[in-house]
Structure formats: C-alpha cells, structure tokens
C-alpha cells in the first residue's frame, strides 16, 4: 500500500472558512433589513415570513432577475459596492408596477474563487437595496465553484416576493383613451444595454475612468445604481388612481410599454418633453447608434412610465416630486387599432 496525500475541500478550490467569514461579515447589514413579518434569522434551511395582517385577500407576486453584463464592467473597474443595489432594483421595480409591496429577497452569488471583500461589498449593496425598497434580505446562496468561473469572476441573481391586495392589482386593464402618461427619471442606463455599452467602449477606445462627462468620470455615469422606485410608487398608488405602470428595462420603450396596454390603445410619447441625460447622448454619438435602436436598448432617462386619468395628473406629479422623483408628463394614451403600440414623436 502506497502513501497518498490526504486531500481536502480547500485543495479542490472550495474554502469553507472563507464562506463562514463572509457570513460573519454580512450579518450586521442583513439584520438591518428585517421586517416584522420575518421569523427566525440567518442560517436556517428556509426563511419563514408571515403575510402582513392588513391584507384581506393577499396575492403573492414573485420575480427574479440579474444585472446582465453591467457586472462585467463592474468587475473590470473593480467597483462592487453598488451592483447589489442594481440586483434588488431590477426585481422590486418589476413587482411594484403591479401594485405589490416587496416582502423578502434572496440572492445567489456564484464565483470561481471566493473573495470575502468583494462578496461582502456586493451583499452589502443588496442589503442597501432592500432597505431602500422596504423588504427583508432573508437568505441566499454563496457558491464557490472552481472551474466554472474564471478566477474571482462572479455572477449574481436575485429573487423577490411581494404582496398585493387582490382587488388592487395593477394590470393595465383600466387604461383607456385620454389617459396621461407620467415619466419617472432614471439614474442612468440602470442595468440594461450593457453589452452595447461595452461594445461602444471597445470600439471607441474610451477609458471610462479617465473620460469625463458632466464633471465626473464616465464610469460613474455607467455604474450609477439602478433607481429604486418602490416607496414613491406605493405612496402614489395609495392616493391616486393608477391605471398601469411600465418598468423600462430590456427592450426599452418599444417592448416594455406595450406589456401594460390593452388592445386598441396606443401610447404616444412626446420626445420634446425631456432631454436625454448626457450619458445617453455620449453613447449614441460614440457608437453611432440609431435613434430607434437607442429607444429599443436603453431607457434614455426614463425609468418608469405611469398611466393615469387626466384629472389625477397634477396630484400625482406633486406627490412624486415631493418624494424626490424627477417626474413629468411624457405623453398620452390614444384609441388605436394600429399594430404600432408606441409612437415617439
């Protein structure tokens, strides 16, 4: 019998001690997100959450998302502190457009080699996003998978569950001719279109860390965290008759607005009602991107579009702007049997 070296999990590239160190590092920030409905703490096999008692006929709303190749840009620039906010935003904003209050959030973090500092920065960002949206970070999975990812590269996914009163679900069915469209300003490209962003950076030869735009590095514009609209929109829904809300993500104006429009209606967008933030002008110029493609790929400064009756517009704008949103009238709904569901003019 020959002597053999005793192998460990760490020899195979999985460091359990690093995983435990990460849990110890993030416990404090995770605890700050706790809602009263959450039962138990971190470490259980599953997270328990009661439904808020104020709901008579509660309907659960779920969603999952990632941040796409914005993650690659963040890794290249070694800036990991806001990517977690992006992750939460992409999920909770999708829930609130249906009238749902986010309850709890879980994350999945996968990497080839776990770097505790990087993972801690990402998860701290997730906790910050949960605080901004009023939901609890109740658990997650950190997977160290050597051979699956290159070095310390990582990927993230988020999962969120919210609740809405059955009679108050917002599904677009109330949208009608004459409704007014209100826009909520975005913080930048949010988390969509980054494969094109990175291609533009490559073709233009631009260094986003040294190129300045509006007095700050282009990198700051490109990595600005996705705006979380939850608290402003939930208050709006309580006080105003909201007919539909579209979250402008992948597919931009052309694909997201029609998702909330009933048959025989058309959204008419007034392009003169706002100016694109400089980052979108830069992207269009540097990449020689056609206008139609810009509106299909990016939000162009508009994170959400809300449809409501004309008499509610002034009240809605006052509420939204008082809550720190940049809100304005961007268009109207018209009766139409055209196959073109969105017109930008």
From Swiss-Prot:
It comes from the Bacteria. GO terms for molecular function: ATP binding; phosphoribosylamine-glycine ligase activity; phosphoribosylformylglycinamidine cyclo-ligase activity. The keyword Nucleotide-binding applies. Pathway: Purine metabolism; IMP biosynthesis via de novo pathway; 5-amino-1-(5-phospho-D-ribosyl)imidazole from N(2)-formyl-N(1)-(5-phospho-D-ribosyl)glycinamide: step 2/2. It catalyses: 2-formamido-N(1)-(5-O-phospho-beta-D-ribosyl)acetamidine + ATP = 5-amino-1-(5-phospho-beta-D-ribosyl)imidazole + ADP + phosphate + H(+). Keywords: ATP-binding, Cytoplasm, Ligase, Nucleotide-binding, Purine biosynthesis. GO terms for cellular component: cytosol. Pfam families: AIRS, AIRS_C. It is found in: Cytoplasm. Its EC number is 6.3.3.1. GO terms for biological process: 'de novo' IMP biosynthetic process; adenine biosynthetic process. It is an enzyme of class 6 (ligase). InterPro entries: PurM-like_C_dom (IPR010918), PurM-like_C_sf (IPR036676), PurM-like_N (IPR016188), PurM-like_N_sf (IPR036921), PurM_cligase (IPR004733). HAMAP family: AIRS. Belongs to the AIR synthase family. PANTHER family: TRIFUNCTIONAL PURINE BIOSYNTHETIC PROTEIN ADENOSINE-3 (PTHR10520:SF12), TRIFUNCTIONAL PURINE BIOSYNTHETIC PROTEIN ADENOSINE-3-RELATED (PTHR10520). This is Phosphoribosylformylglycinamidine cyclo-ligase. It comes from Escherichia coli O81 (strain ED1a). The lineage of its organism: Bacteria, Pseudomonadati, Pseudomonadota, Gammaproteobacteria, Enterobacterales.
